[in-house]
Regions:
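Conserved short alpha-helical segments that host acidic/polar catalytic motifs at enzyme active sites
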Residues: 1-269, 273-276, 285-317
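Glycine-rich phosphate-binding loops that contact phosphosugars or nucleotide phosphates
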Residues: 317-385
Length: 385
């Protein structure tokens, strides 16, 4: 679960647009935040992970509030807010990521399932890695395919169409889910987006083209958008119309425009009279988000969750499962525990209210795993557990 955003504009609004969009998308990941943008022909990247004493988004905002706006010539950029799956919550593991030759910069929402074999293959071709993430592998894979196209055509003078071919070859190698927004250091007037499973929304307005993983990321600045289909590639660049530079886009497929609902997403219950009713009405959408709009559902109808693969041996060694929850989360956990009993081969599956759980409730023999289900983000009794 991550939020991502991108923009190409004919006005100097990139950084403000990215920061405002990430503010609206912060519910998609509190662990880290970052942006990358072209300042003239140079890519500038700034990213932070949250700590126990500092919020990554506030730190990023403060850095750019302290800078003189005249110092930046920002028309194109990408941004990301992270929920850590592959790799620890650190600055270096935060997005955007770049290839080891600094050719490609990307942000990514999703999980690359075959990252281990891809990483080993790229290392054998001389690529290096700074992070523990699956996303850095995609950046290096883009560079690899771009370089191979240069070798095959025996030229260093490659066009932005070669970038698109490199993207096509890259996604053929990937297994999993992804929403990708891509910058190339050779082309400061171009942005690319592609997806498989993870959603990407794209909007073309009078002065800019914007990309977001969900509607709230547009933060009220667009009138309409379309939802990119799986494995289509959106190429975004400038077109000259009557000697005026206009941001434009191209896709292989034809899309129907969707009007944006006019509401203040994060700061008000509008159009509902109060927050409770808004949350009730948004439950179907919340269920879809929990599934990452299908991005966590694999083609064989199994579910892919981030972080499980690294602990799979420990999970398989468990004999007992205990759900701990409070309030409505406790009711949900009661249902989940009954499903676990039916589908899973654990010796025992139990569910406790967090306020009533005691240390003596833990089975005395064999390994026990705990599933803590919070309510509205924070539950004191679960902290106690």
């Amino acid at each position: 679960m991550c939020g991502l955003i991108g923009i190409l504009s004919n006005k100097n609004i990139c950084i403000d647009f990215l920061l405002n969009g990430l503010t609206q998308l912060q519910n998609r990941g509190y662990d880290a935040v970052g942006i990358a943008y072209f300042n003239d022909s140079e890519i500038v990247c700034t990213k932070y992970a949250s700590t126990s004493t500092s919020n990554s988004l506030e730190k990023l905002k403060k850095e750019y509030s302290d800078k003189n706006e005249d110092d930046n010539n920002d028309f194109l950029g990408i941004g990301h807010t992270r929920w850590a799956t592959h790799g620890a919550k650190t600055d270096i593991n935060s997005h955007p990521h770049w290839s080891s030759d600094s050719l490609f910069y990307i942000v990514h929402n999703g999980i690359i399932e075959n990252f281990r074999e891809l990483r080993e293959n790229l290392i054998s071709h001389g690529y290096t890695f700074q992070t523990e993430t699956d996303t850095e592998i995609v950046a290096n894979l883009l560079s690899y395919h771009y370089t191979q196209l240069a070798i095959d055509t025996d030229t260093d003078d490659l066009s932005k169409e070669t970038d698109k071919d490199a993207i096509k070859n890259t996604i053929k190698d990937l297994t999993g889910t992804w929403g990708l927004v891509i910058m190339c250091s050779l082309f400061p007037n171009n942005l690319w987006a592609t997806r498989n499973g993870s959603p990407l929304l794209i909007s073309q307005q009078e002065n800019f083209v914007a990309i977001s993983s969900e509607q709230s990321g547009f933060h009220g600045k667009v009138k309409n958008y379309f939802s990119l289909e799986n494995n289509d590639i959106c190429s975004i660049t400038y077109s000259n119309i009557n000697s005026v530079k206009i941001a434009s886009l191209h896709t292989d497929k034809i899309y129907r425009s969707i009007d944006v609902k006019n509401q203040d997403f994060a700061n008000s219950p509008h159009p509902y009279p109060h927050w409770t009713l808004r949350e009730i009405e948004e439950q179907p959408d919340s269920v879809l988000r929990a599934m990452n709009l299908g991005g966590r559902l694999r083609s064989d109808n199994s579910v892919k969750l981030g972080g499980i693969l690294e602990q799979i041996d420990n999970v398989k060694a468990l004999h007992h499962i205990i759900f701990l929850a409070c309030g409505t989360s406790f009711n949900a956990s009661l249902f989940a525990s009954s499903v676990f009993k039916h589908l899973c081969d654990f010796t025992t599956v139990q569910c406790f209210d967090g306020a009533e759980f005691e240390f003596t409730d833990i089975p005395k023999r064999s390994n026990t795993g705990f599933i803590l289900v919070s309510q509205s983000g924070e539950t004191k009794d679960l902290h106690r557990c």
